[in-house]
A protein has these predicted regions:
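Short coil/turn connectors at secondary-structure junctions
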Residues: 13-16, 66-68, 89-90, 111-113
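Short, well-ordered coil/turn residues at beta-beta hairpins
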Residues: 72-74, 96
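Glycine-rich phosphate/diphosphate-binding loop of Rossmann-like nucleotide-binding domains
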Residues: 1-65
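Alpha-helix-centered segments that form part of catalytic cores
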Residues: 50-68, 119, 186, 190, ...
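Rossmann-fold NAD(P) dinucleotide-binding segment
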Residues: 58-67, 76-93
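Adenosine-phosphate binding glycine-rich loop
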Residues: 91-222
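Short glycine/serine/threonine-rich phosphate/pyrophosphate-binding segments
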Residues: 2-6, 79-82, 101-103, 124-126
Length: 223
């Protein structure tokens, strides 16, 4: 979970990953770690210690307290406790594991103004995609099979109109991207993003409209 979260945040969203915790310890680099390079290094050496241009910490949990924007505990439960919670310097905690923040730590972090994206919401992505897979199995037709060529033909007509209006031909690479119809992966990602966005908005709305609810975790449970 942690690998894929870091990989997509870096490669698709331009995030700078400064710290990674593994079983043998943790590595830190303020200039940023290339997630795939770290993954391949660990695969080859069996550890992250010694990864180039990084600082290694034998006690990996110590870097939980390092300043960052988003902290993603993604492996074990109970890693953020009442003991280390007061020392955390992040703005957001995204719970990608089950129960990584204890009850006492949760209270402390809320008082500190640190936003917690709860596991009950954040871990729903896998279940959502499993639901999509179930729908696909019921129909025995892969997503995009019925409309991909139609979408490509529509895109081609749009490009022809644009080129006609501009009086010049579009760059071939830009044209290829515009012409490409939706494939199964794109459609699944689109459906997942829509589901997660809508769900998060419902959680926020629940928190804002119910005066008894003061945090996202309680709002998620209330839904």
């Amino acid at each position: 979970v942690g690998y894929h979260a870091a990989k997509f945040l870096e490669e698709e969203d331009g995030a700078r990953i400064i710290g990674i915790i593994e079983r043998d310890g943790a590595i830190l680099s303020e200039s940023g770690l290339r997630v795939e390079e770290v993954f391949q290094y660990k695969k080859e050496h069996g550890k992250v210690e010694g990864f180039p241009e990084s600082t290694f910490f034998k006690e990996g949990a110590k870097i939980l307290e390092h300043p960052c924007d988003i902290l993603i505990p993604a492996a074990m439960e109970g890693v953020v406790t009442h003991e280390n919670a007061p020392r955390l310097q992040c703005k957001v905690i995204a719970e990608a594991a089950n129960g990584p923040v204890t009850y006492e730590a949760d209270q402390i972090l809320n008082e500190m103004g640190i936003l917690i994206i709860p596991d009950a919401y954040l871990n729903a992505g896998g279940v959502t995609v499993s639901y999509f897979e179930w729908l696909k199995n019921l129909s025995h037709v892969r997503f995009g099979r019925m409309d991909r060529r139609f979408a490509e033909a529509q895109n081609e007509r749009v490009i022809e109109l644009i080129e006609s209006a501009l009086g010049k031909t579009l760059d071939i690479q830009a044209k290829e991207k515009l012409l490409e119809g939706p494939n199964e992966l794109n459609l699944v990602r689109s459906g997942l993003e829509d589901t997660m966005r809508q769900s998060y908005n419902e959680v926020k709305q629940q928190e804002h409209e119910n005066e008894k609810i003061t945090d996202r975790r309680t709002a998620a449970y209330a839904l």
